[in-house]
Amino acid sequence: MERDIDIWLVGNTGLRSPNRIQEGFRIYAESPFVGNFRGRDNEIGFMNLLNERGIIHNEAGKDASGSHARKWRLMFAKNGLIYPQLKKADGSQAELGALDAITPFGRTFLAADTYPAMQECFLRAMSVEQFPLAGGSYFSPLRWTLALMLELERR
């Protein structure tokens, strides 16, 4: 069975500016939500913290569900900054790392003190992202994009 690849999935977390990510992640790293990022109360708490610090602008009553926090959690996990929740079929959470705890790569990202250093972290995160395809192979959006660019340059 063939499945169309939705290339818009690349980095689609609902965050429109990567320049806010490090500041938002620093707020997470210094918060009581590290490793405690699940559940409505914690999601709303982190969302409110982001709002108080000016990272997001949640108009009063606009988002009462904590969806902003879930977008940030997804982005942190997709970029390897925190340990994602594993499905049992994918292995042991304990072997990977504590759920929503900051990864060594997350610490590297926090330590990035220049714009090029942050860009290198983003590039590293994009270089390992892969999506499973039918037949057991994988699709890498970055590698596909680079291959396409090289082919266009060759022509």
Task: Give, region by region, the residue ranges found by the protein language model.
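Donor-sugar nucleotide-binding helix/loop cap in glycosyltransferases
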Residues: 1-155
